[in-house]
Amino acid sequence: MKSLYVHIPFCDHICAYCDFCKVFYKTEWVEKYLDALVYEIQHKQISGNYDTVYIGGGTPSSLNLLQLQKLFDILSPFTKCVKEFTIEVNPESMDQEKIDLFVNNSINRLSVGVQTFQDKLL
């Protein structure tokens, strides 16, 4: 099985329990990161079809709609035959527009980060 993982290190807030590589969301950083992703794909000549694509983080759902669409456009050459296309989401950064965008870009699996069901602990 051929798999591709794309790390989106941006978060709206930094959680004390998280050990993953992450930084605060800033629009200009996201734009530079997406441009660097394009460069890396071209420079390393990454190609081919993948069985699974997983977009993790950080909090990928913290990106705005235009940034998410740019990310999906960047990854589209690798998702033509994908069986499982996953993105990590935080319920705080989700809305119907993002869900629609995910569906329109063939996301077929969400990984929802639930640390607690107690509001006072969030």
Segments from the language model and where they lie:
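Canonical Radical SAM [4Fe-4S] cluster-binding loop centered on the CxxxCxxC motif
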Residues: 2-32, 105, 115, 119-122
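Hydrophobic alpha-helical membrane-association signature
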Residues: 33-37, 71
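Conserved, mostly hydrophobic/aromatic
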Residues: 11, 37, 55, 87, ...
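A short, N-terminal amphipathic alpha-helix
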Residues: 37-48
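Short acidic/polar active-site loop segments enriched in Thr and Asp
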Residues: 2, 51, 108
